[in-house]
From Swiss-Prot:
Outcome recorded upon mutating Y374A: Abolishes methyltransferase activity on p53/TP53
UniProt cross-references to SUPFAM superfamilies, sorted A to Z: SET domain, TPR-like
GO cellular component, one term: nucleoplasm
GO MF annotation: an example: RNA polymerase II complex binding
Name assigned to this protein: N-lysine methyltransferase SMYD2
Residues annotated for Zn(2+) 1 binding in this entry: C52, C55, C74, C78
Length: 433
Protein backbone atom coordinates (compact mmCIF):
# COMPACT_ATOMS: atom_id res chain seq x y z
CA UNK A 1 0.00 0.00 0.00
CA UNK A 2 1.46 3.36 -1.04
CA UNK A 3 1.25 6.15 1.48
CA UNK A 4 -1.81 8.01 0.24
CA UNK A 5 -1.31 10.73 2.82
CA UNK A 6 -3.76 12.50 5.07
CA UNK A 7 -6.16 15.10 3.65
CA UNK A 8 -5.15 18.69 4.29
CA UNK A 9 -1.84 17.70 5.91
CA UNK A 10 1.67 16.91 4.76
CA UNK A 11 4.88 15.55 6.15
CA UNK A 12 7.72 18.05 5.88
CA UNK A 13 11.17 18.80 7.20
CA UNK A 14 10.77 21.12 10.19
CA UNK A 15 13.81 23.40 10.69
CA UNK A 16 15.79 22.22 13.72
CA UNK A 17 13.23 19.52 14.54
CA UNK A 18 13.57 16.89 11.82
CA UNK A 19 10.35 15.51 10.39
CA UNK A 20 7.06 17.14 11.24
CA UNK A 21 3.45 17.57 10.20
CA UNK A 22 2.20 20.70 8.45
CA UNK A 23 -1.30 21.97 7.63
CA UNK A 24 -2.20 22.56 3.96
CA UNK A 25 -5.63 23.97 4.77
CA UNK A 26 -7.12 26.01 7.63
CA UNK A 27 -8.47 24.21 10.71
CA UNK A 28 -10.78 25.78 13.30
CA UNK A 29 -10.86 24.99 17.01
CA UNK A 30 -12.52 21.59 17.49
CA UNK A 31 -11.89 20.39 13.91
CA UNK A 32 -10.67 16.82 13.49
CA UNK A 33 -7.35 16.94 11.59
CA UNK A 34 -7.02 13.17 11.27
CA UNK A 35 -7.52 9.89 13.06
CA UNK A 36 -5.09 6.98 13.26
CA UNK A 37 -5.85 3.36 14.13
CA UNK A 38 -3.37 1.78 16.54
CA UNK A 39 -0.60 -0.14 14.76
CA UNK A 40 -0.22 -2.27 17.90
CA UNK A 41 -1.73 -1.87 21.35
CA UNK A 42 -2.26 -3.61 24.67
CA UNK A 43 -4.80 -3.19 27.46
CA UNK A 44 -3.16 -2.62 30.83
CA UNK A 45 -3.40 -5.57 33.26
CA UNK A 46 -5.33 -3.57 35.88
CA UNK A 47 -8.20 -2.86 33.46
CA UNK A 48 -8.84 -6.50 32.55
CA UNK A 49 -12.50 -7.30 32.98
CA UNK A 50 -13.49 -3.62 32.71
CA UNK A 51 -12.60 -3.17 29.04
CA UNK A 52 -12.64 -5.42 26.00
CA UNK A 53 -9.06 -6.49 25.16
CA UNK A 54 -9.74 -5.98 21.46
CA UNK A 55 -11.80 -2.81 21.05
CA UNK A 56 -11.28 -1.26 24.54
CA UNK A 57 -15.05 -0.82 25.01
CA UNK A 58 -15.87 -0.32 28.70
CA UNK A 59 -18.91 -2.26 29.82
CA UNK A 60 -20.34 -4.69 32.33
CA UNK A 61 -20.63 -8.39 31.63
CA UNK A 62 -17.70 -8.99 29.27
CA UNK A 63 -16.99 -12.65 28.42
CA UNK A 64 -13.68 -14.15 29.50
CA UNK A 65 -11.29 -16.26 27.45
CA UNK A 66 -12.01 -19.89 28.31
CA UNK A 67 -8.34 -20.89 28.15
CA UNK A 68 -6.52 -18.35 30.31
CA UNK A 69 -9.50 -16.76 32.12
CA UNK A 70 -7.56 -13.46 32.06
CA UNK A 71 -8.71 -11.71 28.88
CA UNK A 72 -12.22 -10.32 28.48
CA UNK A 73 -14.20 -9.53 25.33
CA UNK A 74 -17.46 -7.95 24.14
CA UNK A 75 -18.32 -11.04 22.13
CA UNK A 76 -16.95 -13.87 19.98
CA UNK A 77 -16.10 -11.44 17.13
CA UNK A 78 -13.80 -9.34 19.33
CA UNK A 79 -12.22 -12.48 20.77
CA UNK A 80 -11.56 -13.90 17.31
CA UNK A 81 -10.09 -10.63 16.00
CA UNK A 82 -7.81 -10.39 19.02
CA UNK A 83 -6.51 -13.97 18.85
CA UNK A 84 -3.38 -13.26 16.73
CA UNK A 85 -2.20 -10.96 19.56
CA UNK A 86 -3.76 -12.73 22.54
CA UNK A 87 -2.20 -16.07 21.58
CA UNK A 88 1.21 -14.55 22.40
CA UNK A 89 0.09 -14.47 26.04
CA UNK A 90 -2.77 -16.94 26.48
CA UNK A 91 -0.94 -20.21 27.21
CA UNK A 92 2.17 -18.51 28.71
CA UNK A 93 -0.07 -16.84 31.32
CA UNK A 94 -1.39 -20.28 32.27
CA UNK A 95 2.08 -21.86 32.29
CA UNK A 96 3.81 -19.06 34.24
CA UNK A 97 0.84 -18.45 36.53
CA UNK A 98 1.74 -15.92 39.25
CA UNK A 99 5.20 -15.51 37.70
CA UNK A 100 3.83 -14.03 34.49
CA UNK A 101 4.79 -10.35 34.83
CA UNK A 102 6.25 -8.74 31.70
CA UNK A 103 6.16 -4.93 31.72
CA UNK A 104 3.63 -3.17 29.51
CA UNK A 105 6.49 -2.04 27.23
CA UNK A 106 7.53 -5.67 26.75
CA UNK A 107 3.93 -6.71 26.05
CA UNK A 108 3.54 -3.93 23.47
CA UNK A 109 6.87 -4.72 21.81
CA UNK A 110 5.92 -8.41 21.48
CA UNK A 111 2.78 -7.29 19.65
CA UNK A 112 4.77 -5.02 17.33
CA UNK A 113 7.00 -7.97 16.38
CA UNK A 114 3.93 -10.16 15.77
CA UNK A 115 2.30 -7.41 13.68
CA UNK A 116 5.45 -6.98 11.56
CA UNK A 117 5.37 -10.71 10.81
CA UNK A 118 1.63 -10.83 10.02
CA UNK A 119 1.55 -7.53 8.09
CA UNK A 120 5.01 -6.69 6.69
CA UNK A 121 3.61 -4.13 4.22
CA UNK A 122 2.58 -0.60 5.15
CA UNK A 123 -0.59 -0.31 7.27
CA UNK A 124 -3.38 2.32 7.43
CA UNK A 125 -1.69 3.62 10.61
CA UNK A 126 1.39 4.58 8.58
CA UNK A 127 0.08 6.96 5.91
CA UNK A 128 2.85 9.51 6.51
CA UNK A 129 5.30 7.78 8.86
CA UNK A 130 6.23 4.10 9.00
CA UNK A 131 7.19 2.29 12.22
CA UNK A 132 10.52 1.41 10.58
CA UNK A 133 11.30 5.14 10.32
CA UNK A 134 10.83 5.87 14.03
CA UNK A 135 13.60 7.82 15.72
CA UNK A 136 15.46 5.69 18.31
CA UNK A 137 18.02 8.20 19.72
CA UNK A 138 20.29 5.21 20.25
CA UNK A 139 23.39 7.40 20.36
CA UNK A 140 21.93 9.41 23.27
CA UNK A 141 21.08 6.52 25.62
CA UNK A 142 23.06 6.47 28.87
CA UNK A 143 24.10 3.20 30.52
CA UNK A 144 21.10 3.15 32.83
CA UNK A 145 18.69 3.35 29.87
CA UNK A 146 20.68 0.71 27.97
CA UNK A 147 20.50 -1.61 31.00
CA UNK A 148 16.73 -1.13 31.24
CA UNK A 149 16.40 -2.07 27.57
CA UNK A 150 18.52 -5.19 28.09
CA UNK A 151 16.29 -6.31 30.96
CA UNK A 152 13.24 -5.73 28.75
CA UNK A 153 14.86 -7.86 26.04
CA UNK A 154 15.53 -10.62 28.58
CA UNK A 155 11.87 -10.51 29.67
CA UNK A 156 10.73 -10.59 26.03
CA UNK A 157 12.73 -13.79 25.45
CA UNK A 158 11.61 -15.25 28.78
CA UNK A 159 7.87 -14.75 28.31
CA UNK A 160 7.37 -14.77 24.53
CA UNK A 161 9.92 -17.12 22.92
CA UNK A 162 7.38 -19.95 22.47
CA UNK A 163 5.14 -17.97 20.10
CA UNK A 164 7.47 -15.40 18.56
CA UNK A 165 10.67 -15.33 16.55
CA UNK A 166 13.05 -12.53 17.47
CA UNK A 167 15.53 -10.48 15.46
CA UNK A 168 19.08 -10.14 16.85
CA UNK A 169 19.86 -8.22 20.03
CA UNK A 170 20.95 -5.03 18.23
CA UNK A 171 17.64 -4.84 16.35
CA UNK A 172 15.72 -5.37 19.59
CA UNK A 173 17.67 -2.57 21.30
CA UNK A 174 16.65 -0.26 18.44
CA UNK A 175 13.01 -1.40 18.63
CA UNK A 176 12.75 -0.86 22.40
CA UNK A 177 14.41 2.54 22.06
CA UNK A 178 11.89 3.41 19.33
CA UNK A 179 8.96 2.28 21.48
CA UNK A 180 10.26 4.30 24.44
CA UNK A 181 10.18 7.58 22.56
CA UNK A 182 7.29 6.95 20.13
CA UNK A 183 4.83 4.98 22.26
CA UNK A 184 1.56 6.44 23.56
CA UNK A 185 -0.39 5.76 26.70
CA UNK A 186 -4.13 5.49 26.16
CA UNK A 187 -6.14 7.13 28.93
CA UNK A 188 -9.83 7.38 29.72
CA UNK A 189 -11.90 10.52 30.35
CA UNK A 190 -10.52 10.84 33.90
CA UNK A 191 -6.96 10.29 32.60
CA UNK A 192 -6.75 6.83 34.16
CA UNK A 193 -4.27 4.62 32.34
CA UNK A 194 -5.95 2.11 30.00
CA UNK A 195 -3.05 0.80 27.97
CA UNK A 196 -0.15 1.46 25.62
CA UNK A 197 -0.07 1.74 21.86
CA UNK A 198 1.81 2.73 18.73
CA UNK A 199 0.21 5.37 16.45
CA UNK A 200 2.83 6.05 13.75
CA UNK A 201 1.16 9.02 12.03
CA UNK A 202 0.46 10.67 15.39
CA UNK A 203 4.13 10.18 16.32
CA UNK A 204 5.08 12.35 13.33
CA UNK A 205 3.94 15.48 15.18
CA UNK A 206 6.56 17.51 17.02
CA UNK A 207 6.17 18.90 20.53
CA UNK A 208 5.26 22.36 21.76
CA UNK A 209 4.33 23.56 25.26
CA UNK A 210 1.65 25.69 23.55
CA UNK A 211 0.26 22.94 21.28
CA UNK A 212 -2.31 23.64 18.58
CA UNK A 213 -3.79 20.11 18.66
CA UNK A 214 -4.76 17.56 21.27
CA UNK A 215 -4.76 13.74 20.94
CA UNK A 216 -7.71 11.77 22.36
CA UNK A 217 -8.83 8.17 22.00
CA UNK A 218 -11.99 6.45 20.83
CA UNK A 219 -11.40 2.82 21.71
CA UNK A 220 -8.07 2.01 20.03
CA UNK A 221 -8.36 4.86 17.51
CA UNK A 222 -6.36 8.04 18.13
CA UNK A 223 -8.01 11.32 17.08
CA UNK A 224 -6.23 14.64 16.61
CA UNK A 225 -8.24 17.86 16.99
CA UNK A 226 -7.34 21.55 16.78
CA UNK A 227 -7.30 23.49 20.06
CA UNK A 228 -6.09 26.67 18.34
CA UNK A 229 -6.84 28.04 14.90
CA UNK A 230 -4.34 26.57 12.41
CA UNK A 231 -3.51 28.36 9.16
CA UNK A 232 -2.25 26.72 5.96
CA UNK A 233 1.54 26.33 6.12
CA UNK A 234 1.64 26.16 9.93
CA UNK A 235 3.21 23.22 11.70
CA UNK A 236 0.97 20.98 13.79
CA UNK A 237 2.22 20.59 17.37
CA UNK A 238 1.03 18.34 20.17
CA UNK A 239 2.36 18.19 23.72
CA UNK A 240 4.38 15.15 24.77
CA UNK A 241 4.26 15.99 28.48
CA UNK A 242 2.13 17.35 31.32
CA UNK A 243 2.17 21.13 30.85
CA UNK A 244 1.50 22.04 34.50
CA UNK A 245 5.14 22.52 35.46
CA UNK A 246 7.54 25.45 34.98
CA UNK A 247 9.88 25.66 31.97
CA UNK A 248 12.96 24.11 33.58
CA UNK A 249 11.02 21.07 34.81
CA UNK A 250 9.31 20.59 31.45
CA UNK A 251 12.62 20.64 29.62
CA UNK A 252 14.26 18.28 32.12
CA UNK A 253 11.46 15.85 31.33
CA UNK A 254 11.72 16.38 27.55
CA UNK A 255 15.50 15.89 27.59
CA UNK A 256 15.23 12.77 29.72
CA UNK A 257 12.48 11.08 27.70
CA UNK A 258 12.78 12.57 24.20
CA UNK A 259 16.33 14.00 24.03
CA UNK A 260 15.58 17.58 23.04
CA UNK A 261 15.03 20.99 24.61
CA UNK A 262 11.88 22.88 23.63
CA UNK A 263 12.14 26.37 22.18
CA UNK A 264 8.44 27.18 21.90
CA UNK A 265 7.07 30.60 22.87
CA UNK A 266 6.25 29.36 26.38
CA UNK A 267 9.81 28.10 26.92
CA UNK A 268 11.38 31.26 25.46
CA UNK A 269 9.29 33.84 27.34
CA UNK A 270 8.69 31.72 30.48
CA UNK A 271 5.55 33.84 30.85
CA UNK A 272 3.71 31.42 33.13
CA UNK A 273 6.65 30.45 35.37
CA UNK A 274 6.16 33.17 37.99
CA UNK A 275 2.52 32.21 38.61
CA UNK A 276 3.39 28.50 38.52
CA UNK A 277 5.95 28.90 41.31
CA UNK A 278 3.89 31.47 43.25
CA UNK A 279 5.57 32.52 46.50
CA UNK A 280 3.60 33.39 49.65
CA UNK A 281 3.13 37.08 50.36
CA UNK A 282 4.75 37.39 53.78
CA UNK A 283 5.76 40.50 55.73
CA UNK A 284 9.24 38.98 55.67
CA UNK A 285 9.43 37.59 52.09
CA UNK A 286 11.38 34.34 51.60
CA UNK A 287 14.96 34.82 50.37
CA UNK A 288 15.98 33.61 46.90
CA UNK A 289 18.00 30.82 48.50
CA UNK A 290 15.04 29.61 50.58
CA UNK A 291 12.92 29.52 47.42
CA UNK A 292 15.60 27.57 45.54
CA UNK A 293 15.88 25.08 48.40
CA UNK A 294 12.12 24.60 48.55
CA UNK A 295 11.91 24.01 44.78
CA UNK A 296 14.64 21.39 45.15
CA UNK A 297 12.74 19.81 48.05
CA UNK A 298 9.51 19.82 45.99
CA UNK A 299 11.13 18.06 43.04
CA UNK A 300 12.65 15.47 45.36
CA UNK A 301 9.39 14.78 47.17
CA UNK A 302 7.55 14.37 43.84
CA UNK A 303 10.08 11.72 42.83
CA UNK A 304 10.01 10.10 46.29
CA UNK A 305 6.21 9.87 46.11
CA UNK A 306 6.31 8.38 42.61
CA UNK A 307 8.49 5.57 43.94
CA UNK A 308 6.55 5.20 47.20
CA UNK A 309 3.31 4.52 45.28
CA UNK A 310 4.66 1.08 44.41
CA UNK A 311 5.13 -0.16 47.96
CA UNK A 312 3.61 2.13 50.62
CA UNK A 313 0.09 1.90 52.04
CA UNK A 314 -2.54 4.55 51.20
CA UNK A 315 -2.35 6.05 54.69
CA UNK A 316 1.46 6.32 54.44
CA UNK A 317 1.10 7.96 51.03
CA UNK A 318 -1.44 10.44 52.37
CA UNK A 319 1.00 11.30 55.14
CA UNK A 320 3.76 12.09 52.61
CA UNK A 321 1.30 14.39 50.80
CA UNK A 322 0.19 16.17 53.94
CA UNK A 323 3.65 16.62 55.46
CA UNK A 324 5.12 17.88 52.18
CA UNK A 325 2.27 20.37 51.69
CA UNK A 326 2.75 21.62 55.23
CA UNK A 327 6.46 22.11 54.68
CA UNK A 328 6.08 23.77 51.26
CA UNK A 329 3.32 26.12 52.42
CA UNK A 330 5.85 28.07 54.49
CA UNK A 331 7.23 29.38 51.18
CA UNK A 332 4.71 28.46 48.47
CA UNK A 333 1.20 29.74 47.78
CA UNK A 334 -1.58 27.12 47.41
CA UNK A 335 -1.72 27.85 43.67
CA UNK A 336 1.96 26.86 43.28
CA UNK A 337 2.24 23.84 40.97
CA UNK A 338 4.35 21.86 43.46
CA UNK A 339 1.59 22.28 46.04
CA UNK A 340 -0.99 21.34 43.40
CA UNK A 341 0.99 18.23 42.47
CA UNK A 342 0.85 16.93 46.04
CA UNK A 343 -2.83 17.90 46.39
CA UNK A 344 -3.58 15.98 43.19
CA UNK A 345 -1.74 12.92 44.52
CA UNK A 346 -3.60 13.22 47.83
CA UNK A 347 -6.88 13.44 45.94
CA UNK A 348 -5.95 10.24 44.08
CA UNK A 349 -5.26 8.43 47.37
CA UNK A 350 -8.61 9.67 48.78
CA UNK A 351 -10.42 8.37 45.69
CA UNK A 352 -8.64 5.03 46.08
CA UNK A 353 -9.69 4.86 49.74
CA UNK A 354 -13.23 5.92 48.79
CA UNK A 355 -12.94 8.99 51.01
CA UNK A 356 -15.21 11.03 48.76
CA UNK A 357 -15.38 14.13 50.99
CA UNK A 358 -11.59 14.24 51.28
CA UNK A 359 -11.18 13.88 47.52
CA UNK A 360 -13.74 16.64 46.92
CA UNK A 361 -11.94 19.05 49.25
CA UNK A 362 -8.67 18.57 47.39
CA UNK A 363 -10.38 18.87 44.01
CA UNK A 364 -12.03 22.15 45.01
CA UNK A 365 -8.63 23.61 45.88
CA UNK A 366 -7.03 22.36 42.66
CA UNK A 367 -9.50 23.34 39.95
CA UNK A 368 -9.11 27.13 39.84
CA UNK A 369 -5.28 27.22 39.67
CA UNK A 370 -5.39 24.31 37.18
CA UNK A 371 -7.57 26.42 34.88
CA UNK A 372 -5.02 29.23 35.08
CA UNK A 373 -1.84 27.18 34.58
CA UNK A 374 -3.01 24.87 31.80
CA UNK A 375 -3.88 25.88 28.21
CA UNK A 376 -7.48 26.81 27.38
CA UNK A 377 -8.55 23.34 26.23
CA UNK A 378 -6.81 20.89 28.53
CA UNK A 379 -7.63 17.26 29.26
CA UNK A 380 -6.16 17.76 32.75
CA UNK A 381 -8.70 20.51 33.45
CA UNK A 382 -11.57 18.59 31.83
CA UNK A 383 -10.82 15.45 33.85
CA UNK A 384 -10.64 17.48 37.07
CA UNK A 385 -14.06 19.04 36.38
CA UNK A 386 -15.34 15.55 35.64
CA UNK A 387 -13.98 14.07 38.88
CA UNK A 388 -15.43 17.01 40.82
CA UNK A 389 -18.79 16.68 39.08
CA UNK A 390 -19.00 12.96 39.84
CA UNK A 391 -17.99 13.52 43.47
CA UNK A 392 -20.64 16.24 43.88
CA UNK A 393 -23.28 14.00 42.30
CA UNK A 394 -22.28 11.06 44.50
CA UNK A 395 -22.53 13.27 47.58
CA UNK A 396 -25.96 14.53 46.44
CA UNK A 397 -24.84 18.09 45.59
CA UNK A 398 -26.79 18.00 42.35
CA UNK A 399 -26.54 21.65 41.25
CA UNK A 400 -22.78 21.85 41.81
CA UNK A 401 -22.38 18.45 40.15
CA UNK A 402 -24.26 19.45 37.03
CA UNK A 403 -22.31 22.70 36.76
CA UNK A 404 -18.95 20.89 37.01
CA UNK A 405 -19.93 18.18 34.53
CA UNK A 406 -21.02 20.85 32.05
CA UNK A 407 -17.61 22.55 32.40
CA UNK A 408 -16.00 19.19 31.55
CA UNK A 409 -18.30 18.74 28.55
CA UNK A 410 -17.45 22.21 27.20
CA UNK A 411 -13.75 21.29 27.00
CA UNK A 412 -14.37 17.72 25.81
CA UNK A 413 -16.60 18.84 22.93
CA UNK A 414 -13.52 20.53 21.49
CA UNK A 415 -10.92 17.92 22.51
CA UNK A 416 -12.91 14.70 21.98
CA UNK A 417 -15.47 15.90 19.43
CA UNK A 418 -19.17 16.46 20.14
CA UNK A 419 -20.13 12.88 19.23
CA UNK A 420 -17.68 11.08 21.52
CA UNK A 421 -19.23 8.28 23.63
CA UNK A 422 -17.69 9.80 26.78
CA UNK A 423 -19.76 12.96 26.29
CA UNK A 424 -22.99 10.97 25.81
CA UNK A 425 -22.18 9.06 29.02
CA UNK A 426 -21.66 12.28 31.00
CA UNK A 427 -24.89 13.79 29.63
CA UNK A 428 -26.61 10.57 30.70
CA UNK A 429 -25.18 11.00 34.23
CA UNK A 430 -26.65 14.51 34.39
CA UNK A 431 -30.05 13.29 33.12
CA UNK A 432 -30.29 10.34 35.50
CA UNK A 433 -29.63 12.39 38.63
Amino acid sequence: MRAEGLGGLERFCSPGKGRGLRALQPFQVGDLLFSCPAYAYVLTVNERGNHCEYCFTRKEGLSKCGRCKQAFYCNVECQKEDWPMHKLECSPMVVFGENWNPSETVRLTARILAKQKIHPERTPSEKLLAVKEFESHLDKLDNEKKDLIQSDIAALHHFYSKHLGFPDNDSLVVLFAQVNCNGFTIEDEELSHLGSAIFPDVALMNHSCCPNVIVTYKGTLAEVRAVQEIKPGEEVFTSYIDLLYPTEDRNDRLRDSYFFTCECQECTTKDKDKAKVEIRKLSDPPKAEAIRDMVRYARNVIEEFRRAKHYKSPSELLEICELSQEKMSSVFEDSNVYMLHMMYQAMGVCLYMQDWEGALQYGQKIIKPYSKHYPLYSLNVASMWLKLGRLYMGLEHKAAGEKALKKAIAIMEVAHGKDHPYISEIKQEIESH
